[in-house]
Amino acid sequence: NFQLRFTDREITPWGGISLMQRMLEQVGLEAALRQCGLPLPGSNRGYSPIQLVTQFLLNIWCGGNRFEHAEAVRHDTVLQRLFGFARMANFKALIRFFNKFNQATNAQVFGRLYRWLFDQLQVYRLTLDLDSTVMTRYGAQAGAAKGYNPRRRGRLSHHPLMAFVADLRLIANCWLRP
């Protein structure tokens, strides 16, 4: 037996996100993002880089796998209030933000984030596994080039280098090179 009743309170299909929001507060991600040198908006009306990163994570946690999927989360007023955003950014704002990243910015931002992460974990010995693979590409994909490809000789491919922290089951870094 259960009761059905109506209420004026707003609801969200992503109620479990409140736990993720609490986790972000407890680990201090916002403070870490402030110090890692995120690219700033080009306008004084722009969104905070921390909000854009948080919205990007929120989109992924809610099942989005494209920038456009952020629109479903953007219009959820419960999530907006939960994360303390005055307004939510359009998916194009996320695209513009991530287009500001280049190889130097990536090295700076992620170097600082990884340092913060490993300081939080307080791990003093690590096993670092390095690996590479060949990913055959079909069609005209950005960054693909002819190179070493034992399966499909002469085809375009990427040859990424990957580093894993075996003890933590964590990807330490990945370089998607042609």
Predicted regions mapped to residue ranges:
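Dynamic "connector" segments at or just before major functional cores
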Residues: 1-178
